[in-house]
Amino acid sequence: MAYARTIGTGPAGGTFTGRYLVVLGDDLLGDDDGPARAAVAELTGLADVTSSRDLSGPPGADGVHPTLLAELGVAVAELDDEHLRNARADPRVLAVEPERVQRALTGSPTSGPGLSVDYLRGFADAAAFLRDQAIGNGAGTAVTARFADTDALTWGLQATGVDAASETGAGIVVAVLDTGLDLTHPDFAGRQIEARSFVDGQEPQDAQGHGTHCTGTAAGPLTPGSGRRYGVAHEATILIGKVLGDDGSGTDAGILEGIEWAITSGAHIVSMSLGADVEEVSPAYENAGRRALDAGVLIIAAAGNNAERSAGNVGFVGTPANSPSIMAVGAVDADLAIADFSAASSSVEGGQVDLVGPGVDVYSAWPMPQRTDSISGTSMACPHASGIAALWSQRTGARGRELWTQLTDSAQSLPLPTGDVGAGLVRAPGE
């Protein structure tokens, strides 16, 4: 069964696939997935329940998807009304929620047709913000950016102190779950990259651009050359999980499969520049984030682009970034002002912005033959934080929750509301 079909938009927001995510209690989980498998069979009415531990390859290989993601404690299945009622009433089940479609949280002036509304909105808002900067928001005063790209460095690497850090990310594994990577890109030559696709019928090759750009920011070329450096943790090991298709969208099931694969493949940090404009917390993503932290893995996600601050709308952090156990990253511009599109904290538990990173007019890799591009979004801020997390992890050995605290404690305080920027601007280790 393909994961890409959609059948409607629900009252709580987001596009639904018609399937459900069943979050199992910890009592069913362990080294033996037999109890969880039996419970899922009973709850769904399925005669045969495939566990992710049954698969010799990664989930999604050869079109085979597990019903049970054993490491995350989440099952994915269609439920009729009777089984849905029974699952929601079962004490072994923490939650049952509809499966949604998530989208890349950015926009690009060079992207092709078929992009989502959220994708295009991110670029439109960013473009409006840059225009407002140029004219001083109508006040007749031009704004001079505090940072700017140079021939040697992007403004984002300068603003976050990456240029002064001695760490390179060596020995740290960063998984980027996105639209894949342009595996032919010369800037990634010489790297040993493990790439997997969790999108039916599509290879890990990035035909969209978003994943290549985010991977470029998080890591970039293995050895920064004579051109402008844009990658943060250039010696980190990269895992590429294609969880969003060439149209920039993907299902919860595919994304959760990617998270589980990243954890079991040894990732220390998982970077996810994706989401949906849904304010309620997803129990499935919260369970995944919590179990990742328990395993010493930090998941970092883009806060969202649903704000239009110039029109008085501050937006809200969407799923999955609003999960209490997933770090949410907002965006600032080169003057360290909050980006017009960057979502603010919401009142739901976990719905706060934890950090901000460079997210306006960010220069990074782009699929060939273009090679590079500058685009905007909280998607661009997220991999800055993920790459810097790798630098800190290399320096201190911090993992999981300890690494989360390291990032927030070392952030640069900004003269902006904490609801917009959290602990402040993510900063690389200093001397």
Located regions from the model:
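Autoinhibitory propeptides
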Residues: A4-P11, S52-D151
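Short glycine-/aliphatic-rich beta-strand segments at the starts of folded cytosolic domains
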Residues: G14-G25
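Short glycine/threonine-rich catalytic loop with a Thr-x-Gly-x-Asp
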Residues: T15, D206-T212, G248, I375-G387
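Structural recognition of the beta-strand scaffold that forms the well-ordered cores
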Residues: L21-V22, V76, V173-V176, G216, ...
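Solvent-exposed loop/turn segments at secondary-structure junctions
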Residues: L28-L29, H83-L84, R100-A104, G180-L183, ...
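C-terminal subdomain of the subtilisin-like protease fold in secreted/lumenal serine endopeptidases
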Residues: L68, R229-A233, I240, I259, ...
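Subtilisin-like serine protease catalytic core
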Residues: D163-E194, Q202-A253, S265-I269, E279, ...
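Extracellular S/T/G-rich loop segment that most often corresponds to the catalytic His/Ser-adjacent loop
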Residues: D178-G180, V297, G318-Q394, A398, ...
